Amino acid sequence: MKKVRKTCAFTGHRPKKLPWGYNETDVRCVAMKVALERQIRSLVQEGVTDFLSGMAEGIDLLAAEIVLNLRAEYPCIKLHCILPYKGQETEWSAASQARYHAILAQADSIIYVSRIFRKNCMLERNHFLAAHSDVLLAVYNGEYRGGTAATIRYAQKLGHSVIILDPTK
């Protein structure tokens, strides 16, 4: 009998909504990275083997890098990149684009929700993440509006477990 794989998806804010912005040396960002790694380790110990990242700037990229770094210790874990459309990174800085491509090069799979940009492709990506996970790990500041909030509500509507880390604390 084939063993069922448990899946965790990530959702979280982009840098403009994070207290540290793009400054990953800020103590609040360092603390969030530690909290994310601790939570990911805990999920692996609970049997989660597959991690889904939407690969947006901010929390998605941070979480994806943590999963990749933990693969040396936990070779059973997989990173699946769920992209809203081909070329989502083209308007980003050169450094962010390089980071994005480095993660994609190490991913176990890449899934495009759409090949081209469409009005709802980000929402569709977020719904895909929630629908294809057992657990949603969210870095969320409590604002009602926005993609992170909508993804959390959708996962809850589906009856999935949601773990929230607050970037303001």
Where are these regions (language model features)?
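Acidic/glycine-enriched connector segments
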Residues: 1-169
